């Protein structure tokens, strides 16, 4: 996987966290830069670790599916992308019922884990490709940190408008990456 594909994957993986952070930011009284950076760091670290876990699981199973590796990567990315699109379409607007000034660590960590499960599944798929998993995981973590930080700060203004569309866009990008992997492996474009 080349640098551009890695960066696009990292950006796509950060869309769940961005959408969640927008909702978290929308539910805060006045999100500060400190709170946004704290949230971004929590989301980024967790999002960077989950593809490493998935990659380790994929490596353990790789000898059994080497002949189908491109189909596995495509299938996982397609399913995850479709799931993100469906969840984005179903997602309701962010709730503004009560507005704390700060979210607790465990709430943010649990939200980060929930939004990073797709990165773990992507890590499984990446085990079947020629990628530097550490670089990819760091790119995913850095992108997620940036996007979650921005999401908190933008949440107050964009929550009702952008939240669901960010997730839909992330799903479309994942399906595109999966299709690109399949087309490249099958040699359909030369």
Swiss-Prot record:
Keyword terms of this UniProt record: Cell inner membrane, Cell membrane, Ion transport, Manganese, Membrane, Transmembrane, Transmembrane helix, Transport
Organism: Erwinia tasmaniensis (strain DSM 17950 / CFBP 7177 / CIP 109463 / NCPPB 4357 / Et1/99)
Single Gene Ontology MF annotation: manganese ion transmembrane transporter activity
Entry protein name: Putative manganese efflux pump MntP
Main localization category: membrane
PANTHER family (alphabetical): MANGANESE EFFLUX PUMP MNTP-RELATED
NCBIfam families cross-referenced by the UniProt entry: PRK11469.1
Gene Ontology, cellular component aspect: plasma membrane
Domain of life according to the entry: Bacteria
Family per record: Belongs to the MntP (TC 9.B.29) family.
């Amino acid at each position: 996987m080349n640098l551009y594909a890695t960066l696009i994957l990292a950006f796509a993986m950060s869309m769940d966290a961005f959408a969640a952070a927008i909702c978290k930011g929308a539910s805060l009284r006045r999100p500060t830069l400190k709170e946004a950076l704290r949230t971004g760091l929590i989301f980024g670290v967790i999002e960077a670790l989950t593809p490493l876990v998935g990659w380790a699981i994929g490596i353990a199973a790789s000898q059994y599916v080497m002949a189908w590796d491109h189909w596995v990567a495509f299938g996982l990315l397609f399913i995850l992308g479709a799931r993100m699109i469906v969840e984005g379409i179903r997602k309701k607007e962010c709730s503004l019922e009560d507005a704390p000034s700060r979210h607790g660590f465990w709430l943010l960590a649990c939200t980060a884990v929930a939004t990073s499960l797709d990165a773990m599944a992507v890590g499984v798929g990446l085990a079947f490709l020629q990628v530097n998993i550490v670089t990819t995981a760091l790119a995913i973590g850095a992108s997620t940190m940036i996007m979650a930080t921005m999401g908190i700060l933008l949440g107050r203004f964009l929550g009702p408008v952008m939240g669901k569309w960010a997730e839909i866009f992330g799903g479309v990008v994942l399906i595109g990456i999966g299709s690109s992997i399949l087309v490249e492996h099958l040699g359909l474009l030369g």
